[in-house]
Structure formats: structure tokens, C-alpha cells
């Protein structure tokens, strides 16, 4: 099975920003080796909720169904059984078969007016405590499709009153229920809707009808970071350091809110209009006040030793993923990628990888301090932000129209 190019804001079949190019391959993995990984409790395949899956795919690991620790999601009503309307597995546009009895919700009841630096508009949302905006499909003008996925589609949209440009994700309840990933959607909505950071894609709210769930998201016109990596093959030190700095700042914020992402990879990162990085997919994230979990999830190439060995894990899994991502930025492929998933597991367990000669010594130092078998020995996020390689190379572009430093 090939690697996923999950696209929140650019379709695989509609060339929006630049032509799609084929990226590095990934070895298909239906489940982890029984001799090395604690087998999942359920037989539910781990499907991606957001973004297309009709393109080369990096295979997700089969996983248990995580439950929010000490947290009851407010989005429990998202996937109530449909009482009317025709459900179909064939993707439709959001304007087709409109249901007059739409149920609308806002997952952000205390939001102030949000100004978009990307579009220069403001999305009017409730400011008063307890007041909820009752969204419905008629509130939006639907534009061109941005992406097509296994569970639905993504559309460019504009809120009628404010003219705010956004992305509207349309997910089909029948397909979500068939795949058994309702819990994943609820968790994603619950977590992402409460996060406010310039390097995290904003989820403004959601609404649903008998057949579909609609997610109201920021529009990131720069598209998916993975496609940019495919286009450039690899990034230089300046561009890599800038992205790692922005991601470290976003993860530091998430961890302060007791949120573990657990699936950091290029496919889950988008670029804003100024080239800034944005975390866009929280499908595998978890709010874990207990800080210790055993669920196996994420992508094979990015799994840390403690997860493939079935040990308890905490927010330090994101430090490992940050190290893998930094290596992939600089080299163009993950450090533990091999011809077989068994060998990949072995190399991860042994932390066995090599650097090409063109990787700088300072970059090697940062990666090596993140890719530690013992989670407690990994460089913390504050240490990442203070690392000499990051400080030296992560200068922000001065002008909006200027390319990122080191862009190839």
C-alpha cells in the first residue's frame, strides 16, 4: 500500500496549487508483528477521518478505541442514528439533498470574533458566555472542492454574513459508522475546537443533518506540507529549522493543555498564506490528564519504541515524532524506513539509523537528542526551541510575498 497524501485543503484529483507528484513509498502494514507489539483489543481498522484517501497512502496502524480520560466529549450527538434522509456511500456535494431538519451546534460557545490574516475577513461567532451559534448549511456559499476522502469531501466555502473564507469538511455518517470511527471524530472535534494557537488549524464549530457531519475549519491556502516536501525532495537547514520551531511551539501549547497529538507527520501539516506551519489533524490525539496511555496508534515510520513495544506512553511520544520529522525534512524520507515492516520495527527498537553526509553536525545533534529509546532522555520542547541549530536557522521571512528562507 502506498503512502497517504491526505489533503485537507487540496484534492488529489483537482490540481489546485501545483501538480501532484509521487512521493516516497511506504511498506503496507495491516497490523504490528505479534512478537513485538501488544495486539489491539479490537479488530477495527484505523481509518483517517479528515482528508482524502484515494491517493498513495502511508498505512495507519490498527488500534484500540481510545477513550478520553476524565473527559466526556460534548460532541456525542454528532453521529446519532439518522431518522430521515437517504444515506449513500457515494460522495455528494454539500448542496445536494439538503435536509430542512438540520441539527446545528457550536463546539466553541465562548469564542470572540475571529479575524483571518489569510483572507482579511472576520467570522462572526458568539462572544457571550453560554451563547451558541446555530450553524446550518444555508449560512455558507459553497465553492470548489478542495479534497475528496474516504468519509466525504472538503469544500472551499464563504460565510454569507461576514464573507469569511473557510474550509467546510463534509463527512458521511454512514461511512463513519461502517468504519467504526465515530469515537475518533468526536475526540477530534472535542480537542481541536478548544485549541487556539497560530500554528494549529482552527476548528470553529460543526453542525449535522440526518446523513452528514460538517466541520467548519480555517482555510490554509498553502496546502499540505507533504506535497511541498515531495516537490522539493528535501528541505535545507533554514526551512527545516523554521518548521520544527513552529511545530515545537504548537506542541508545547498542546502539552500545556494535556493534549498529546500522537500522529505528527508531513501529511498532517498544512501551510498558511504566509508559509506558516499548521497542525491540521487531531484524529489520533488525546486529552489525557493522567498522562499515561497504552493505545497503539499513529503511522509506522513515526511510532516510538515505547508504543511498538506495548509500554505505557505519555506526551514524550511527540518528541520522538518531532525527531523523525526533522530527519525526514532534511533527508526526504523517515530514518527507519526499510523494505519490510518487521525490519522497520527492529530498527525503531534499536534506534538504528544513519545520516547522509550532507546533514550538518548541528542538525544531527538535535535529531539524535530527540530519537532516544528512553523517553525521559529526549530533549524537551523548550530545549528544542533553544537548540543552536534552531536559533541559527529559524529566521522568519520578512515579507508575505517572499519565499521561505532556503526554499528550493
Curated annotation (Swiss-Prot):
Q: Can you state which reaction this protein catalyses?
A: L-seryl-[protein] + ATP = O-phospho-L-seryl-[protein] + ADP + H(+); L-threonyl-[protein] + ATP = O-phospho-L-threonyl-[protein] + ADP + H(+)
Chain segments carrying region Activation segment: 287-300
> Coiled-coil stretches, from where to where?
none
Localization recorded for this chain is: Cytoplasm, Cytoskeleton, Spindle pole; Cytoplasm, Cytoskeleton, Microtubule organizing center, Centrosome
Origin: domain of life: Eukaryota
Q: What is its main location?
A: cytoplasm
The record's listing under InterPro entries reads:
Aur-like, AURKA, Kinase-like_dom_sf, Prot_kinase_dom, Protein_kinase_ATP_BS, Ser/Thr_kinase_AS
Task: Give the compositionally biased regions (Polar residues).
Answer: 85-110
Q: What class of enzyme is it?
A: transferase
Q: Its GO biological process terms?
A: cell division; meiotic spindle organization; mitotic centrosome separation; mitotic spindle assembly; mitotic spindle organization; peptidyl-serine phosphorylation; protein autophosphorylation; regulation of cytokinesis
Residue intervals of the Protein kinase domain: 140-390
* Record protein name field: Aurora kinase A-B
Binding residues annotated for ATP, in chain numbering: 150, 169, 217-220, 281
